[in-house]
């Protein structure tokens, strides 16, 4: 598997991860209970069937995975059944149950339906760079990333992770790049961007499959629009879209990176897993260090 998005968090490089493998067996995902809506806990990066190797580490990169089980119980189904019961009571007793009774009836319905509800499984993966003090979560959702930080915090007892903080406004950097300012070495423009009028409720322009250095784009910039999302290519190895929230979306590993796998000495599924982990973690580190310098990202130490 390859990461498709990157939500970064920083943490002090002095954070101690030495007890992770000892702590993980006590924080594993448990099957969601009959009367529970969801369950969450760590699973092995190698898959749920793996019970021994609960983390994976190569040099200063650590791979952790959180699994989830969620009951699928649409609110519309519950509300429809509740309405039927309310109508039955109204027809038999000539009254419409009030708020407190309605809540009790809804709770009873949930207890009745939950054991029969379908369960949806999920997983979230993260690479932790112990040397440079960042976590890269494979998600485009800040909220999902925060949940992962909470899971690590619960595992370690404390974990002072924080979202990326740029000392220079990301919009100004992205807007400058599309306006013709020099890009960092190795970066080039892709063919996608989003621009917004800075006033609240202002116009939004989205461009795809388009040359970004052109008169049309310049007109929008001259009108005061700022770049909020920008497609970039990092050497021949990565393509992605970065937003002014510093979340990396639509991440793709290109031939320049994937060619390294063809020359890897792979022998079996586990060896292939190791090769992909080593490749991804190394490329993501290179990208992070580039973004750190370009956006003047604050340290967590």
Swiss-Prot record:
Subcellular compartments: Cytoplasm, Nucleoid
Main location: cytoplasm
UniProt KW keywords: Cytoplasm, DNA recombination
Statement: the UniProt record of this protein carries the keyword Oxidoreductase: no
InterPro entries, A to Z: RdgC
Molecular function, one GO term: double-stranded DNA binding
Keyword Cytoplasm: yes
NCBIfam families: PRK00321.1-5, PRK00321.1-6
Family the entry assigns: Belongs to the RdgC family.
Primary role: May be involved in recombination.
HAMAP family the record matches: RdgC (MF_00194)
Entry protein name: Recombination-associated protein RdgC
Gene source species: Stenotrophomonas maltophilia (strain R551-3)
């Amino acid at each position: 598997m390859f990461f498709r998005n990157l939500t970064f968090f920083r943490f002090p490089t002095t954070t101690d991860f030495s007890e992770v493998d000892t702590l993980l067996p006590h924080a594993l995902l448990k099957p969601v209970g009959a009367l529970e809506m969801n369950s969450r806990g760590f699973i092995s990066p190698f898959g749920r069937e793996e019970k021994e190797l609960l983390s994976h580490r190569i040099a200063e990169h650590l791979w952790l995975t959180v699994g989830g089980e969620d009951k699928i119980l649409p609110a519309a189904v519950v509300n429809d059944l509740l309405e039927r019961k309310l109508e039955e009571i109204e027809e038999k007793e000539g009254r419409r149950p009030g708020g407190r009774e309605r809540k009790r009836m809804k709770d009873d319905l949930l207890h009745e339906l939950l054991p029969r509800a379908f369960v949806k499984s999920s997983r979230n993966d993260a690479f932790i760079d112990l040397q440079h003090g960042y976590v890269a979560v494979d998600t485009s959702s800040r909220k999902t990333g925060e949940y992962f930080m909470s899971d690590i915090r619960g595992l370690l007892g404390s974990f002072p992770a924080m979202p990326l903080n740029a000392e220079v406004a990301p919009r100004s950097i992205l807007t400058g790049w599309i306006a013709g300012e020099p890009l960092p070495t190795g970066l080039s423009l892709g063919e996608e961007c989003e621009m917004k009028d800075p006033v609240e409720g202002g116009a939004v322009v989205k461009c795809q499959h388009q040359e970004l250095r052109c008169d049309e784009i310049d007109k929008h910039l001259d009108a005061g629009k700022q770049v909020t999302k920008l497609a970039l290519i990092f050497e021949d190895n990565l393509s992605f879209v970065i937003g002014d929230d510093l979340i990396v979306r639509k991440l793709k590993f290109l031939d320049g990176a994937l060619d390294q796998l063809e020359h890897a000495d792979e022998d079996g599924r586990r060896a292939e897993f190791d090769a992909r982990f080593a490749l991804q973690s190394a490329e993501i580190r290179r990208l992070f260090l580039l973004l750190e310098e370009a956006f003047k990202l604050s340290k967590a130490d």
